[in-house]
Structure formats: C-alpha cells, structure tokens
C-alpha cells in the first residue's frame, strides 16, 4: 500500500492488475523473482537484482507511475515493482520484510483472496513457498533493506 500511496501522491494512479492478452483480472500472490527494468539504471539497488531475486508478492493492483518516477524493477506479471521518485522516495510493490510468522498471519486473515487467486490449495502452496524461499532469501533481503536505508540516509 505504501508504494501505491507514494505514486498517487506524486500524480500517479492505481488500477486493477490485468492479464495482458485477455485483460482478465490478475493477482500476484506468492514468491517470484523481480528483475532490473533497465540495464542503464545506476541505482545501487539494481546491482542486487542482477541475480534471481525472489520476493513475496501479495497484491491485485498495479501502479501507474507518475512522470517523475524512475522504474527500477519489474516482475513477469507486474511491471511496476520497484521505483524511485527523486533521491529519497522508493516504492516497493513486494515484501522483503516478511517472515514465516507474518506469512502465516496473512494466510489466516486473507483466505478468500488466496483461494480466488491460487485455488483451494492456495494456503498450502504459500506455506510451501515460504519454507522454500523464506530462510534461503533472508540474507539477500536484509542486504536489500540495508542498501535501501543507506540510499535514504
């Protein structure tokens, strides 16, 4: 929600995420990679994204970036995953802060959304993904957060 508010406050907008060809509603929920949007982007965060960078996605919207935003990273389903507006404002449409307890809480509280996106086995799928990626990606996610804080200081 913070990335959406940041973009909206700067003149952007938010709309439902749609599948490109069918224009049917699409949601991103679960672990998947983000990747650099442009090779020319010199943002320090970009270097962390050169390798596969799995993060947790949990949204059904996309951000229409304002003209002042610079797109840094995308995913296969949603172009607007990481962006900056000026040197001190960054928007993330994914979750690097997540731990197993948080995922389990979200799974418990968001069952309807999970089922609508992933089907009846959605809760099981998310728990399995968390076991697969949670601890394995912790170091890279902490490095991402540390680099982001360095950029903001």
Which residues fall in each region the model found?
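Cysteine-nucleophile active-site neighborhood
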Residues: 1-38
């Amino acid at each position: 929600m913070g990335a959406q508010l940041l973009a909206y406050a700067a003149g952007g907008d938010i709309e439902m995420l749609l599948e490109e060809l069918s224009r049917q509603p699409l949601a991103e929920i679960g672990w998947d990679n983000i990747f650099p949007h442009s090779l020319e982007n010199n943002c320090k965060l970009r270097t962390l994204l050169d390798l596969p960078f799995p993060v947790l996605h949990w949204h059904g919207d996309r951000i229409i970036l304002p003209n002042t935003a610079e797109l840094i990273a995308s995913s296969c389903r949603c172009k607007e995953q990481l962006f900056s507006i000026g040197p001190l404002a960054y928007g993330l449409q994914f979750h690097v802060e997540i731990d197993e307890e948080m995922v389990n809480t979200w799974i418990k509280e968001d069952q309807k959304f999970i089922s609508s996106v992933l089907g009846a086995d959605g809760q099981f799928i998310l728990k399995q993904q968390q076991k697969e990626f949670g601890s394995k990606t912790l170091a890279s996610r902490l490095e991402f957060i540390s680099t982001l804080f360095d950029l903001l200081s």
